[in-house]
Amino acid sequence: MDHKNPLVSWNVFGFDLVFNLASIMMLVITAIIVFLIAIICTRNLKKRPSGKQNFIEWIFDFVRSIIESNMAWKKGGQFHFLAVTLILFIFVANMLGLPFAIVTKDHYLWWKSPTADATVTLTLSTMMILLTHYYGVKMRGTKAYIGNYFKPFWPLAIINVFEEFSSTLTLGLRLYGNIFAGELLLSLLAGLVVSSAWGWIIGIPGLIVWQGFSIFVGSIQAYIFIMLSMVYMSHKVADTH
């Protein structure tokens, strides 16, 4: 069954801006969950961590290892909180659409993973790529940063600029494609369960297996997004490109 997105459009200076209300709602929910995780896991910190403090410290150590695998900690340390926030945000966003979906009588899909929306993932990737440019200019200087696009000879500038656009697209669309495909198959399996009396024989085992696989894929995609983001960042802030 085809689902529709709850869209609203605003006319601004003659241009129609279309917003997906479901994606906005799910992004807010994701942000709230990440905020609560941060608050709960960092309350009453102790020198000897246990339980939830162990979890958040493991996340920080894991992300630090990603950063250190791409650049010196002296430069990469300032991106630590950014990367931790991103990996938690993307992981939670990837997981939200797995347990269930909420669809109204009019077939409007309200509850889903926000990362199953290409607009969301491309916005995340665009923001990340723009941040790499910002820190590249800030840490290396405008002249050195722009001049690097023309090395070792100026015709490469065209290829380097094209690479920036392709990096943005691949970073965002990779995340979107994997999460969207996972939720699509889950909806098909759920439809198989309710479509016939015998559908549950295949549908329920398939749902269980695919749910587990989707958790794995969602986790891997969060890791890949952060890893590639730090790779791109290291290329921009390093003294050599």
UniProtKB/Swiss-Prot annotation:
GO BP: any one term: proton motive force-driven plasma membrane ATP synthesis
Family annotation (InterPro entries): ATP_syn_F0_a_bact/chloroplast (IPR045082), ATP_synth_F0_asu (IPR000568), ATP_synth_F0_asu_AS (IPR023011), F0_ATP_A_sf (IPR035908)
Alphabetized UniProt keyword annotations: ATP synthesis, Cell membrane, CF(0), Hydrogen ion transport, Ion transport, Membrane, Transmembrane, Transmembrane helix, Transport
Cystine connections: none
PROSITE patterns reported for this sequence: ATPASE_A
Annotated localization: Cell membrane
Keyword Hydrolase: no
Broad class of the protein's primary localization: membrane
Residue runs in coiled coils: none
Membrane topology annotation: Multi-pass membrane protein
Transmembrane segments: 21-41, 83-103, 117-137, 175-195, 218-238
Quaternary structure, from the entry: F-type ATPases have 2 components, CF(1) - the catalytic core - and CF(0) - the membrane proton channel. CF(1) has five subunits: alpha(3), beta(3), gamma(1), delta(1), epsilon(1). CF(0) has three main subunits: a(1), b(2) and c(9-12). The alpha and beta chains form an alternating ring which encloses part of the gamma chain. CF(1) is attached to CF(0) by a central stalk formed by the gamma and epsilon chains, while a peripheral stalk is formed by the delta and b chains.
Role noted for this protein: Key component of the proton channel; it plays a direct role in the translocation of protons across the membrane.
Family: Belongs to the ATPase A chain family.
Protein name: ATP synthase subunit a
Native source organism of the sequence: Staphylococcus haemolyticus (strain JCSC1435)
Lineage of source species: Bacteria, Bacillati, Bacillota, Bacilli, Bacillales
Gene of this entry: atpB
